[in-house]
Amino acid sequence: RDLAALKVPGVKPRELNAHNLQPPLDQRDPAEEMLLLDADANAHEIIDTAVSGFSFTITAAPGTEPLRTAVNIASALMGRGKSVLVVGEKRSTLAEFSALLKRTGIESLRYDLLAEHDAEAQRAEFIRAIVRNESAEEPNSEDLNEELVATRAALLDHTRALLNKDSNWQISVYSALQRLAELTASEDGPATRVRFDRPMLDSLMEREQVRAELVRLGEIDGFASASRTSPWYRARLVNDEEAAEAYALVITLKSSLLNLREAMNQTSAMLGLRRGRTISEWESQLAILMRIRETLKRFRADVYDRPVTDLIAATASGAWRRENGIEMSSMQRSRLRRAAKEYILPGVNIGDLHEQLKIVQAERAEWIRHIEAPRTPQIPENLDQLAAALNSLVSELAGLGIVLTDTIEGTDFVRTDLDALDARLDALMADRVLLMTLPERDALTQKLRERGLSELLDDLYARQVPTEVVSAELELAWWQSALEFLLQHHEGKLLDGDRLRDTESRFRRADYAHMTSAPARLLAKVARVWTERIESEHDQAAYLKSQLRGYEFVLEELLTHAPVMARTLLPLWTASPFALARKVPASMRFDTVLLLDSESTPLAANLPAITRADQVIALGDPHSGYPSPFIVSAPTFGAPEPTDEQLDSTFDVLATILPNRTLAMLHRSMDPVILDYLNREFYGSQLHAAPVSRASAQPAGSLTVEYIDTRGKVSDNANLDSPGVEVERVTNLVLEHAYRTPDRSLAVVTASPKHAQRVAESVRHALSLYPQLAPFFAAGEESFRVVDLTRAETLERDTVIFSLGVGRARLGQASYDLGQLSAEHGRQGFVVALTRARRALRIVSCIDPSELDPQKLHHGAVDFYHLLREHAERQAREEVEAKAQRVPETLPRNAFLAADDADTPDLGDWLLNDLVARLQAHGVRVTRGEGDIALIAHAPEKLAAEPVPALGVAPVVSSNPSVPAAMPLVACSDGEPNYARASVRERTRLLPERLSRTG
């Protein structure tokens, strides 16, 4: 119908669009889902696009299992009450499609136009369909659906809780976990246990300035013990100028103290004074000397030689003596008064001798306390200078005391032991570096404390945190605090490990049961539609009844007069292009047509199908197939294919006007070189294969290349086609395979019909010599075959030998005509050759690519050349890597050789790196994997032979029991965006099942 829109020949209509209009899989009602087979995310997107009603093409590379997708598209459409016509050119394709229907249990919904039924058989088939509808029972899935929805919702809530961002902080639980894993990745990373409250977290959203201030505080020893044990700690200094002045004052004090102490020591030695231990004692000593000096202006110095208490009593009044209980005769008083006057210096008149003598007595008592032995006082000549120096020192100390008021040692300098004071001044002088940064340190500390960071500052100081970690400590405190708030906010939605595993396990069981019940649900749905249409299509229902009850049943009449009821009873029809045109009237329409083999079917052959449907979906692989002309008579051997008419495939034509989708998931393994080359050069790098481990029951595909040296060998054929040495070598490989691995199917594919014929004849001849190998070559489902590329498209075997079949000229030059690879469709032949093997592909060739000039090659021969070169380069790399591997197992084991110096692999994800660190902490050696395999975990020796039940597979155990087991791991975080975008079914059941199957 789209082709009919081409009003002007040669003018392309605008390209149509195709979109997935279905709700996300995780939001759908399970009761409405009708998929019969598991589908990966890419295939599910294609199925949903089909259900949305769009026409498009599907590129299906070998190994992507397009028939599974076709069955799912058909079942999903039938679940919507639609009819589906499936057309395939090849009987093998339709047979495989039918086998899938039978396996899923919905074969009764199909009408096979290829089956040769008479009228009664056709009538019986429609009657069986009515009986099927009338007996169909709606499965009781209510409890199952509730469990599926509940567990799915819990897993969705868990992932959303991991990824939902806080409206203010713009972070998620997952990003917080990643950041914390990054912060704590190293052994010397941050370790603070300080937590912030919500207001503090809000205030620290922009914390660059705070981080810079903390780092600066660390640079100026803000978190070093020296900063708090410094004699300047808590000093009151506002700026650098005050710090410099304080330091200069200390230097002055040190000098003044030293000079004064020396002078005081000299004075003490001269006067017989005890050496003062404090400035206060110096003050007392100088004070008594000053007073004595004043007294000696009136009295002689010997007045201090003895006590003058009797003189004091004699010169006192009678009342004083009575008050003090002293009795003294007048004669005695007279004598003592005369004696007292003898101490008075000549010319000095003392008005109150009694009071002056009391002063002398007090001074004498104080003098005695300061001298080491009794002696007459002397007044040093430099007394005034000493007093002035002392006053200056005390004044300077008072200035220092203002600065050091809040220090732990205090500021009582005058009562401080002189040695301690001297030591303190020395300490103050020695700590100049900390002093000069003190104002900035105090200012930063005060500023940060005002921001509410006191607890963090105290913690950083208590742990003596190095400057380079300070910033990370702030980050750890912020992110850990934020994470705890986020966890509280999402409490109930986030699942811990045990609950997550339990919920996933419940979902897997429910989803598996749900998929198992899909056929019953689809049959019940078809039965409901049948019941509804009996009412809505009353006339057609009546005609159907009359036909089934009538004497003669004519299918064409039924399809003409009751097409809706026919499609409702049997909503899935399969046919070849020719059977469709022959058996179905042109008026019979279907909702959707699925065109299988569309890359190898000419457009003209599929026009009857295309014009019968509003929705057209073409599946095929234009890179591995092409249409061939229909030939009635047998061709002459060796005759070239007719080239008069250029055939356009259905796929190629529809691809010019319809959007294209590509099945991306490969369900079988390929050698990495083959997969990389095909993916890059043919499939736009859209293909993806699950990684395969050596522990898998389906080992990774392998590619081996063998070049036959023809030098000095004489071939039985004179031309370059099918050299005898290659035929002989391939025959030997076939016999070797039959003997060594008879459980694996085998085929030989060649690049020319002649070479295929010669190899087949050679194998038949060899078999007569080795009859014991005959069972391997017996006919069967996957019997041994030898075919050329044109007949290999539908063939698949465990092992395939691709024999090029091209030799050299007599002069030894390499041929540039590589048979069918060099032909027009050689690129398709190349893809076919590389994709026929499920397990192992062996290429045998007499021509080495190093002998060829790629500029002289054409079509698939160019691809063949480049593939061989890439294979050789990979082999060379692997040889280099093998030589760089660990010490050979044959060497004696010892701790030195067993030590692994390899760096810890960086997986590009901090949580996964944390996993690696934890594995290593348990003695597991971890090495980097390749491709999707994130890492290889080598178990400790004591665990090397033990299975790992949690992973569902046994470890790969070396034949040498001393070699640790190797477990390949595909790892991802459940908060990764790719993980979150995947449906719960994909990430919880399908992906783990795929990885389990591949080891």
Which positions does each model-derived feature cover?
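Short beta-strand-loop-alpha-helix junction that forms the active-site gateway
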Residues: D932-L990
